Amino acid sequence: MSHSSEQEIIARLSHAPCGKTVVNHLSENCAHSMLNACRWCAMCGKESKAQLDTLELYSGVELCFQTYLSSQFTHRHDAPASTVMEINHCRAGRIGWRMKDGLSLYLGEGDVSLHSMSRCTQSEIEFPLHCYEGLFFSVDLDALDANPPELMREAGVTARGVYERFCQENSAVLSACPQNASIFDGLYTIDRTILLPYARLKFQELMLVLSRTPAPVSAPTPYKADQIAVVRQIHEELLSDLGQRRTIEELSKRYLMNPSTLKDVFKFVYGQPIAAHMKEHRLERAALLLRTTDDSLSEIAAQVGYESQSKFSSAFKSVYGVLPREYRKQTFRLKSE
């Protein structure tokens, strides 16, 4: 996740109260919102922040933008009276659900998921990167198919048909691709004065595309909850002391997990191999130390796990585009202006 995306999320939630979920209804029919009808609620930590912006597109179709600063939420709602499909898109960060059937599902930037709303009546939502921005469409199959919008009607596309293709037995995940981006990205940036007609067009485009998209060959990998819990413990240990480098073999012996399974589950949860993920954290911490301390480059290199200052400088430049010394100069220059 880019530093700029994280800062945008922090800024957007700067006025949101801690420990609360703020729900804004962007359309007049908020009393008929599916979130209200299903008595949706989320319980979060005292330091967490969340904002949901909902918009009714058609009878039976709602769009909800969601922004979180949190590591975990407990989320529950009543089972809907009819079949409701939820289509999620991740714009920034990473999100994971532990559904009531034990299945864990994770999305990274650009990914799309589809599942029945009855699967997540009570679920734990995790944000491995501690912040998240995305959206989801809630689609009541019967209500939409009873009065479909023009483009879907002309193309012979039904909500029930899309549901049966992707959600009949399991949840489905469609990996990030240019087609996903072309449908979803504009929804986050379009002028709010034309959001409703634009979102209606994009929803119809999405349904037409999904009606012609093959369902994934395999369902999301059903890793066990205890395996994910162990990997989260490992992640916390790795972050607790960035100056130490621990091998996969060492971790697998200590936590009694097969090395291959450890690597697979870690990537499933955090979206990256262990080495790449930890490199990001090491260099983010290094950038913070360069901005906020007078520590020497060799001291900072050691604090983030680099024995060689030259290797540290090379790794830093590969991510930030400049050497650490120049990065520090640029930071001080901006502060003095």
Residue positions per predicted region:
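Conserved hydrophobic/aromatic pocket- or pore-lining residues that grip, position, or stack substrates
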Residues: 199, 238, 262
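Glycine- and acidic-residue-biased ligand/ion/polar-headgroup-sensing regions
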Residues: 71, 81-102, 111, 141
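N-terminal low-complexity or simple alpha-helical regulatory segments
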Residues: 1-82
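Ligand-binding loop in jelly-roll beta-barrel domains
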Residues: 48, 57-61, 77-84, 118-136
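Alpha-helical bundle regulatory/interaction domains
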Residues: 98, 103-232, 248, 253-259, ...
